[in-house]
């Protein structure tokens, strides 16, 4: 409870700071990222109506804030208070304690064989491996998978 209160307080303060900032700089070559906020064990921050976190996601989006919410339970992102997955620009999936069929289907827009393939890939992920949504080939009409499997040695 104390840790939750501290994170809640910090998120509220970040909201105050980011509301005052101008929009992030964007041009053809780059997008300015001012700050990363990483919340590990994020399920503790997603299981209640966390207005400061929802505001931070909304405000931070065009102010150069990148928020990483990490949890081993993907169901946490489908909170009854807020759909965090719908607001995720780059959802990354690492090894999970349990795999939610509905979240995989919603996130990747797959059914049947493609769904079973992604689910199997997630179940087989090893330390340092992740799956990222990547429908580039499909959008170009070239077929291909709706995801990429990546080996990560350093996140930041």
What are these regions (language model features)?
Residues 1-117:
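Conserved P-loop NTPase motor cores
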Residues 5, 121-156:
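Conserved P-loop NTPase motor module
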């Amino acid at each position: 409870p104390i840790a939750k209160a501290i994170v809640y307080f910090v998120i509220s303060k970040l909201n105050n700071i980011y509301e005052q900032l101008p929009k992030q700089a964007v041009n053809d070559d780059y997008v300015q990222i001012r700050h990363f906020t990483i919340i590990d064990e994020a399920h503790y921050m997603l299981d209640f109506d966390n207005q400061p976190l929802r505001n931070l996601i909304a405000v931070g989006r065009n102010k150069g804030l990148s928020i990483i919410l990490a949890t081993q339970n993907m169901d946490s992102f489908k909170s009854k208070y807020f759909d965090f997955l719908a607001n995720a620009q780059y959802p990354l999936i690492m090894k999970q304690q349990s795999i939610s069929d509905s979240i995989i289907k919603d996130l990747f827009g797959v059914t049947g064989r493609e769904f079973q393939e992604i689910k199997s890939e997630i179940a087989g992920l090893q330390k340092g491996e992740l799956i990222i949504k990547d429908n580039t080939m499909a959008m170009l009409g070239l077929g291909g998978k709706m995801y990429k499997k990546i080996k990560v040695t350093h996140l930041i």
